[in-house]
Amino acid sequence: DVPDDHIMAEPVCRGTAPGIAWGAHRISMFDSQAALIAVPTDQMIINDDAFRKNVLDGMAFVQQNNYFLTMGIVPTRAEPGYGYIQINSHVCGNIYKVKTFTEKPDREFARMFVDSGEFVWNTGLFLSNVSYLRECFSEFLPDVLSSLDTETETLSPSQEEHFIRKHFPVYPNLSVESGVLEKTGITCVMKCDFGWADLGTWHGIYEALPKNMEDNVV
């Protein structure tokens, strides 16, 4: 069972940056040296064992290094509905520095990305140690973390949630990629092989699921 104070519900949608900032704040109250993984819900993981290995390897990396580590998948087709990460210099193992992020390019650019061999799909999964994550949020999104740190430090989880319901709607509507990851200059990407599909669109669902003889998904 998951304790109640480990379950946090955003009162309104404000992109991934504010929600992750709140989650990191709560986690740091329990363990300031923790490593965390941010996992979007609208996706499919095909190979659980490979995913578990990639996550454990990634956790070990961010516990030893102050980096954001995104998880990328080598693309199998030119998919304009996905985000893409351009890889840069090699760091270690299957980990590389990130050169660029591109969100949902048109089909022609997606095809160029795939043909170049320099890009992986952006799964939206990323890892970091909590200390470095909070340091970066304090630098790049101070209006998010400063109020959490100064005004909720002595609050109970229920009191903190009351504070969030009041203040969360005025937080910036930003993804963590555009709000933080693209600004640090030292984000890394792991080339993963666990099999992945984005289920955020009907097309993504169609591509991920088996088809019948008429090429339909039921």
Regions found by a protein language model. Name each.
Residues 1-3, 185:
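Short, structured coil segments at secondary-structure junctions
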Residues 3-9, 145-148:
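Short hydrophobic/aromatic-enriched beta-strand-loop microsegments
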Residues 117-119, 123, 139-142:
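An anion/pyrophosphate-binding glycine-rich loop and adjacent beta-alpha core
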Residues 130-218:
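Left-handed beta-helix
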